[in-house]
Amino acid sequence: MPMHFLLRYELSPDYLARRGEHRDAHLSLAWAAADREELVLGGVVGDPVEEALLLFRTREAAEAFAAADPYVTSGIVTGWRILPWRTVVGEDAAEPVRPA
């Protein structure tokens, strides 16, 4: 069954204070994944920031991204998990479903 995969990041309480040191490397990794059409969207959630979500086309791409992400390896991401997401509405839906 076609799906997208959400990479969900739990962030350290001092995420905003610490991210600057690793931000360029993180964004380079993210844009490279987007250029390969693996990463659809990504960013932080909340104001103030609560967590981050990144939407991938495959579980493997999400796993590889998390393993290489400087935010993860530096510890400012304190936990992560990948959630399968059966997208059914929108131009980029993995499995578009229209009303009968």
Specify the residue positions occupied by each region the protein language model found.
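Conserved, structured core segments of small domains
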Residues: 1-100
